């Protein structure tokens, strides 16, 4: 089975990145699941509640730590929404 481009590229990079934990991989996978899929590096809306449920992350602190580290490591671009009724924006980076 051929994987979709962003997730395949992420898994290749993640296999060599010792900084990533299973929670990072699970969170990225949940973002990929909720991404529109047509344009790999476009921004799309995500909600913390949905991502935490799908990735099985129970702690809000762990969620924010993983988001912050995925941004710092260059795997995603994240634009938080400080409005509780609006979803945040995220883009899965496709840099090699």
Residue ranges and their predicted role:
Residues 1-54, 85:
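Short recognition helix of helix-turn-helix/winged-helix DNA-binding domains
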Residues 1, 95-96:
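Generic structural signal for short, solvent-exposed loop/turn connectors between secondary structure elements
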Residues 35-94:
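Winged helix-turn-helix DNA-binding recognition segment
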